[in-house]
Swiss-Prot record:
Main location: membrane
InterPro entries, alphabetized: Ala_export_AlaE
Name used for this protein in its record: L-alanine exporter AlaE
GO molecular function: L-amino acid efflux transmembrane transporter activity
Organism expressing this protein natively: Aliivibrio salmonicida (strain LFI1238)
Encoding gene (name): alaE
Amino acid sequence: MSRKGPFSIRNAAADTFAMVIFCFITGMFIEIFISGMTFEQSLASRMLSIPVNIAIAWPYGVFRDFMLRQGSRVSSMSFIKNVADLTAYVLFQSPVYAAILFTVGASTDQIITAVSSNAAVSCVMGVFYGYFLDACRKAFKVPGYTQRV
């Protein structure tokens, strides 16, 4: 994936929409069904994550595009693109996620479980998020956005 040309509001809007929706749904699932958080804790975490995700969505998109470019220098295989997507997702999201959980009062054990579970699930989730983000960028008609690989 690459975004060619200057910053566009469509790009930021697509990245923000994708991150808020995807992280709300997947985060709640992990927190309740894997980490053992209560519905109320998870809902508080997800509500706090919305403004955080709005703030980090576009920078994450830029970071992801950078990681994809680095991966494409190694190989143009879709496997390498998926590895780059996964790496970008885990490296960028894990510290942010831990901070959100700490802020809403999750225990240290819950934070460790949630962040490590999220990293493990990201082996699939990060790649799906990449596809979801690509679809959102296309739906938002991001100028100059092209699909490579």
